[in-house]
Amino acid sequence: MLIPVFGFSQVEAKYFNAAWNSSNDINWFMGLQDCNTKGIVDIGKDKEAQAKYKIAVIPTIIIFKDGEEVARFQADLSFKMVATKEEVQEEINNQLMSDF
C-alpha cells in the first residue's frame, strides 16, 4: 500500500452506473486503495453527471489526478466492465508514483 504524502497529487476514482444495470455492478470499486473513492454515481438519476463526464456506456470508472481526468475504464457493449480491479489499481499506483 502506498502512503499518501501531504503536498503531492490527489488521486480520485469515480464510478458511474445506473440502477437498471445493477447486475453489472463493480463490487470491488470501494476496495481500491490509495485514492478517494466517491461511491456510485447513478446516471439514471443524475443526468448532469452523465453529460459533464461524457458517460457513453456503463459501468465506467474515471481516474482523476488533481481534478483532471487521466484514465477511463468502460464496459463493453454487453455492459460488463472489461478492466479488472488489478488494472484499475495499477493505474492509480502509476499516477501516484509519477510524482516521484
What do these predicted regions represent?
Residues 53-64:
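Structural micro-motif
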Residues 2-4:
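N-terminal signal peptide c-region/cleavage motif recognized by signal peptidases
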Residues 43-50:
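N-terminal post-signal-peptidase region of extra-cytosolic proteins
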Residues 6, 50-53:
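Structural motif
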Residues 7-39:
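Local sequence-structure signature of Cys/Sec-based thiol-disulfide redox active-site neighborhoods
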Residues 13-15, 60-62, 72:
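Soluble periplasmic/extracytoplasmic beta-strand elements of cell-envelope proteins
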Residues 63-100:
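Non-catalytic, surface beta->alpha helical segment in thiol-disulfide oxidoreductase systems
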Residues 27-30, 55, 76:
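Short, glycine/charged-enriched secondary-structure capping and boundary segments
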